[in-house]
Regions:
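C-terminal substrate-binding subdomain of Rossmann-fold SDR/epimerase-dehydratase oxidoreductases
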Residues: 1-115
Length: 115
């Protein structure tokens, strides 16, 4: 079955859960001077690129229906995914790139669901 998406042209960011936990852990030991920090990979991309790559990695690129649905109207900007304040506070924390994180997740799902 095809997964239906809008045009998926908005920026987006994915972070592997281990990197997220590392960032939160480090923040717990720091005196912070900001009201909030964006925790992300530091490498945001257009959502369409992520969706196509996931399709390729699971062997179903033809099932990624980009542009099948209307745009949902949600608009993000690249600057919303800026993690430089966090990196300057706790140092580099993201160590698992998108492909490696998605592959780890795919393998976990296969083992968990016995696919």
């Amino acid at each position: 079955k095809e997964a239906a998406f809008g045009p998926a042209l908005q920026p987006y960011d994915f972070i592997y859960v281990d990197d997220l936990i590392e960032a939160v852990y480090r923040l717990g030991f720091k005196e912070t001077n900001k009201p909030f920090y964006y925790i992300g990979s530091g490498n945001p991309k257009v959502l369409k690129d992520y969706l196509i790559r996931i399709g390729e990695l699971v062997g179903c690129a033809d099932k990624v229906g980009i542009g099948v649905r209307e745009d949902d109207g949600v608009k993000y900007t690249m600057d919303m995914f800026d993690n430089s304040n966090l990196v300057s506070t706790i140092g580099e924390y993201a160590s698992i790139d998108f492909d490696k994180g998605i592959n780890k997740t795919i393998n976990w799902l296969k083992n968990s669901l016995m696919l």
